[in-house]
């Protein structure tokens, strides 16, 4: 019997063939084990391949054991080619296998994969691969350790091995734990407050559920980009923080210095600010500048050292970390939605008027803290598919988590969400089927089109003209999800379109193509503003997946900034649209203003600095006001309709329009 530390030592070490063979012998007790690993032909991309033996499980499934040494590309970033090797496991000399446990060892690094490959038999079945990524750089690896301990306890069967590699179980476990933390965070006794209107003491828990979901979204994004070494671990290390924060009490319920000093400065003054522009806010008359550091009094180190603490983090842009506080200089009313403020004034009961309060214990409590929860799970920036899944929390699976949290914020589904343990989402295979069928239908449901989507597609040089025509048709599509929720459909559309484009044009760049598709082809609408933010979060993580590793010698550490998606994903009621007979919003006399508005939003998509975004948003507002004047001069538009259009601001992440117009809000006429 192996204990947890023995398993952890095995999984956290670099791969050793003899050590692995010993593990197979002790853990699985295979009935057929080669005395020496039997060399097998290595496919393209591998230096060596070995067949180690096979076993018959308690439920009569035959499972083979294989090892490949991977020579081309990092095993931690390369999966599609590995899955294509599985058909080679069917060899008359060994007999047929129902499944295989395969090690892919990267000879150029310490990383290695352990994959459970199912559905090998039969030419019509597309093999499924479920994978753990192991090695010294992969952290504590709590998930595989606990899963293999359970496998050892219940006994080795096909069903129990598949359970040990189950992504669905992982997601459900994570959601249940996160939901318990969410309920704790929103409980009034926990004491979390966000000021909202600073003049009203009674509203500082208004929409507290959405505020906590937004906090979770921002933190989970940070957790993902930690996988790319873009944020230092020291910002989440309790012991190191004791030397940074003044009077830091991590278990305290009456102190929120960590959220204010570390997380708010990370979100709003670091990830949302260019590296060269980072500084502390000092001018008392410029409280509206929400990209400057605050709370120097909460640190035990000087301001220069604080800037150095955050100095290795790139500027990401994108709006996810834009402070949502609204000031009277630009609006009729001031609202502290995020509560990022130097003003420490309090009401008579001690609650902040302008500043958010989140207790330290919510993050660091030994039993219930969020960081302990997150550290118990493995995260991956790789995007899973129905046929190829790493057993870790990936961006798509987190969509399921957020879909359930969003269901809790809806009064109609709140009680069901509390009891459901995570069922308010469309399963991935169904989403993928819907997306594929929609694209095939739009592109022309022919045998050639379907072949491009088939798992066994192979590029045919004689069809180059057809591929070019298909590429042109694909890039001309405008696709809208009118109730995008947490973004499952837009994410699947992005993945399918990218995969098809890569198949028919292997020369395209994945990162640039994703940006182009997001800018020109994919749109989303949802009545909940927080749902729109989650959709954008998932698209951002998808973009991060394709970034090159950081390069400290280059500006912004070699990391491109994220686009602004405010005019691509909007919060509105898609059920309320103009009457078909009135869809003349962009008639000839409005064309010039319309084109100017579209150009401003195109520029805003790529805008990087706070000043540039403000300039474009002010310009956008003027153009919208001009269009309203022109609309009032045209027949066919009611006063109510014009009023709704006039008050819609695409850059207000807290607001949802009671009206939806794809022409007005997205600048597009033809959608699928």
Residue ranges: model-predicted function:
Residues 153, 227-233, 473-476, 480, ...:
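Class I S-adenosyl-L-methionine-dependent methyltransferase module
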Residues 62-73, 639-648:
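Short, basic, glycine/proline-bearing loop/turn elements
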């Amino acid at each position: 019997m192996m204990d947890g530390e023995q398993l952890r030592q095995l999984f956290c070490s670099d791969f050793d063939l003899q050590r692995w063979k010993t593990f197979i012998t002790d853990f699985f007790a295979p009935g057929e084990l080669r005395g020496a690993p039997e060399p097998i032909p290595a496919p393209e991309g591998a230096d060596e391949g070995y067949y180690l033996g096979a076993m018959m499980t308690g439920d009569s499934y035959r499972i083979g054991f294989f090892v490949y040494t991977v020579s081309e590309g990092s095993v931690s970033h390369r999966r599609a080619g590995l899955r294509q090797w599985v058909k080679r496991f069917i060899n008359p000399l060994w007999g047929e296998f129902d499944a295989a446990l395969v090690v892919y060892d990267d000879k150029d690094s310490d990383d290695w994969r352990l994959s459970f490959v199912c559905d090998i038999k039969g030419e019509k079945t597309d093999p499924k691969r479920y994978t753990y990524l192991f090695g010294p750089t992969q952290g504590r690896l709590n998930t595989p350790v606990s899963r293999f301990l359970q496998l050892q306890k219940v006994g080795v069967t096909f069903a129990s091995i598949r359970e040990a590699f189950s992504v669905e179980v992982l997601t459900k476990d994570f959601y249940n734990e996160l939901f318990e933390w969410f309920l704790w965070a929103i409980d009034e006794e926990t004491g979390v407050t966000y000021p909202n209107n600073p003049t009203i003491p009674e509203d500082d828990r208004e929409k507290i559920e959405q505020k906590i979901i937004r906090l979770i979204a921002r933190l989970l994004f940070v957790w993902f980009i930690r996988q790319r070494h873009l944020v230092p671990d020291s910002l989440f290390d309790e012991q190191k923080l004791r030397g940074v924060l003044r009077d830091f009490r991590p278990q305290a319920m009456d102190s929120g210095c960590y959220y204010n000093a570390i997380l708010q400065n990370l979100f709003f003054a670091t990830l949302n600010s260019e590296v060269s522009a980072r500084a502390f806010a000092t001018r008392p008359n410029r409280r509206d500048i929400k990209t400057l550091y605050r709370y120097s009094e909460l640190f035990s180190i000087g301001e220069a050292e604080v800037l150095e603490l955050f100095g290795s983090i790139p500027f990401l842009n994108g709006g996810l970390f834009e402070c949502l506080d609204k000031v009277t200089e630009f609006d009729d009313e001031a609202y502290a939605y995020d509560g990022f403020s130097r003003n420490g004034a309090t009401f008579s009961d001690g609650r902040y008027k302008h500043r958010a309060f989140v207790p330290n214990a919510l993050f660091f409590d030994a039993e219930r803290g969020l960081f302990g929860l997150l550290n118990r799970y493995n995260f991956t920036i790789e995007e899973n598919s129905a046929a190829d899944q790493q057993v870790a929390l990936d961006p798509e699976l987190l969509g399921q988590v957020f879909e359930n949290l969003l269901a809790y914020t809806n009064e109609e589904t709140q009680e069901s969400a509390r009891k459901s343990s995570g069922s308010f989402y469309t399963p991935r295979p169904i989403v993928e089927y819907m997306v594929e069928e929609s694209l095939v239908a739009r592109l022309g449901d022919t045998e050639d089109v379907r072949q491009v989507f088939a798992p066994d597609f192979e590029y045919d040089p004689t069809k180059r003209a057809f591929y070019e025509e298909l590429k042109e048709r694909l890039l001309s599509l405008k696709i809208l999800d009118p109730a995008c929720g947490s973004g499952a459909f837009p994410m699947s559309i992005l993945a399918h379109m990218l995969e098809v484009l890569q198949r028919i044009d292997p020369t395209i760049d994945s990162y640039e193509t994703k940006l182009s598709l997001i800018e020109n082809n994919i749109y989303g609408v949802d009545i909940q503003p927080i749902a729109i933010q989650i959709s954008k979060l998932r698209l951002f993580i998808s973009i991060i997946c394709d970034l090159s590793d950081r390069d400290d010698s280059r500006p912004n550490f070699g990391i491109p900034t994220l686009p602004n998606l405010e005019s691509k994903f909007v919060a509105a009621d898609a059920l309320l649209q103009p009457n078909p007979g009135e869809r003349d919003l962009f008639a000839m006399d409005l064309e010039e203003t319309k084109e100017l508005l579209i150009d401003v939003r195109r520029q805003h998509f790529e805008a990087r600095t706070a000043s540039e975004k403000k300039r474009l948003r002010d310009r956008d507002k003027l153009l919208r006001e001009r269009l309203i004047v022109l609309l009032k001069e045209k027949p066919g538009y009611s006063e109510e309709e014009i009023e709704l259009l006039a008050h819609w601001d695409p850059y207000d992440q807290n607001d949802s329009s009671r009206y939806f117009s794809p022409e007005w809000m997205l600048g597009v006429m033809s959608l699928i």
